[in-house]
Amino acid sequence: MALLQISEPGMAPAPHQRRLAVGIDLGTTNSLVAAVRNSIPEALPDDAGRVLLPSVVRYLDKGGRRIGHAAKEEAAIDPRNTIVSVKRFMGRGKAEVEGAANAPYEFVDAPGMVQIRTVDGVKSPVEVSAEILATLRQRAEDTLGDDLVGAVITVPAYFDDAQRQATKDAARLAGLNVLRLLNEPTAAAIAYGLDNGAEGLYAVYDLGGGTFDLSILKLTKGVFEVLAAGGDSALGGDDFDHLLFEHVLAQAGLEAAALAPEDVRLLLDRVRGAKEALSAAPQARVDVKLSTGEKLAQTITRDTFAALVEPLVQRTLGPTRKALRDAQVSAADIKGVVLVGGATRMPVIRDAVAKYFGQPPLVNLDPDQVVALGAAIQADLLAGNRSGGDDWLLLDVIPLSLGVETMGGLVEKIIPRNSTIPVARAQEFTTFKDGQTAMAIHVVQGERELVSDCRSLARFELRGIPPMTAGAARIRVTYQVDADGLLSVFAREQHSGVEASVVVKPSYGLGDDDIARMLEDSFKTAEVDMRARALREAQVEAQRLVEATEAALVADGDLLDASERATVDALVVSLRALAPGDDADAIDAATKALAEGTDEFAARRMDKSIKRALAGRKLDEI
């Protein structure tokens, strides 16, 4: 039916002249996307009105997959092919995740980043994360009505270079232009600071599903300065789940190794539900029937849970104390503590934070959404949509020192941790032997003094150094960190001018060949994806047209005679019956038939509206 949809002036959620950019919180447990609409940052919901997308991907045979809620619901029945908490594996080698608590996956021993074998082939954490990011990108484009110019994606402040590079690789694979990687606590501060006009020293306590960050920020007249950052990239809400999981098993006299993978996933799901219930109730039940027929039924009290997880709570306070020392402030100097991450809903966490800082934490912003909202504000700025009064300066820091290996396997730090980014620092080195014409440069990241205790980021060689006596050559090594926290290294021999450089892409990141292969794989499933999208679009349009036609019949059904009304009713019935089906062509045909069958009805309604508007008015008044 030829019905026009007209918005009031200025009421469009995103005016066409704006460049559409979003903020994405790629979380361990849940992910979400937000955008600035009508000058207000808001999280974008899916078709069912749900803002949070579970960070879960299930791979099916023959290239199919389920993402988000559907995958989460099927995790217990197919645990080996359903990847959860993939963020914990980003930028990590097999040796670093082999002991991942109760993970039912088959990890593949491959160079660089760990990979997981599924029924659809071997998948890297980057590929899994890309599925989640692509889903959020599609949600944003559907909601905002146009393509995105880019996204600000948040990462834990304590993510190292390898993990940050892996995140950018995933975004690239998902078809997203990354405007910036933004530290999660900093994003939260942007959302909180701009929303409340806050000034002073603030601590951002960020406990997500898989990572913990503590940042000390100074907010002064639109300047967001990160004074210090600390944390643990292997500590999060999942660890609280696993402690309670082990407790329930111990009480039942069972061991995780003896359980079937589907029972492990089912029990973990029930335990997580009990943990969440304890945030609002003094006790919760865990009731599970295992595949063996055995039943587990236990009552967990809030006090029992608090005692059980106390060691994990204390683990968060270690980086907190360290960050305060680095910032040269005390807990008493902190004006407010912002909580970020769903895990901060636990009373045991809120009580510990309140006790340590001597004040109740700030909880007026949704801890699940605040990071994405801050990222959306930053994305809107970077996209060029800033309006008067929106000026602010963001001064972030690197979480770990960057250095170079020197003789004896020692580390010489070039850029110390908590340096404000972007930053460039240089230092001069010399040759060790007479006649030395080349120098191997090994880039490392970490706080330890020995190379063996730090993370290796890259190696390259500077060749063509003129032969000189040992100590005569002057090699200037420059480290440059961009706003995303990613590193480039340049080396130059001062006498001859020979130079070499490397953009650090860690061994745990992806090479261009890997990206190309993954893109090729995505092309193979593109046809399936497009068919699914076409079907969904056809169903939505059919539903819209049915509802619009029925509303028009209620309002102006008297404009049709009995025969015409019967024809329209039949077309509506036909389309309503086809709409839930999976034949997009049939739905499109029925939609077209109803639209054409109501053209005359639409024209009569238009005539009626015009006559009503002109009734009683003279020609010179029109």
From Swiss-Prot:
One of its GO terms (molecular function) is unfolded protein binding. Keywords: ATP-binding, Chaperone, Nucleotide-binding. The gene is hscA. This is Chaperone protein HscA homolog. PANTHER family: HEAT SHOCK PROTEIN 70KDA (PTHR19375). Disulfide bonds: none annotated. GO terms for biological process: iron-sulfur cluster assembly. InterPro entries: ATPase_NBD, Heat_shock_70_CS, HSP70_C_sf, HSP70_peptide-bd_sf, Hsp_70_fam, ISC_FeS_clus_asmbl_HscA. Belongs to the heat shock protein 70 family. Pfam families: HSP70. It comes from the Bacteria. Chaperone involved in the maturation of iron-sulfur cluster-containing proteins. Has a low intrinsic ATPase activity which is markedly stimulated by HscB.
